[in-house]
Amino acid sequence: LNPFRWMINKYREWKNKKN
């Protein structure tokens, strides 16, 4: 598992939820 990729995914999800 790639934690970095997971972070990006979480960040993208959070950005989507914010907007």
UniProtKB/Swiss-Prot annotation:
Keywords attached to this entry: Secreted, Toxin
Organism from which the protein derives: Cupiennius salei
Family, similarity comment: Belongs to the cationic peptide 04 (cupiennin) family. 06 subfamily.
Tissues expressing the protein: Expressed by the venom gland.
Record GO terms (molecular function): toxin activity
Localization in the cell: Secreted
Recorded GO CC terms: extracellular region
Protein name: Short cationic peptide-6b
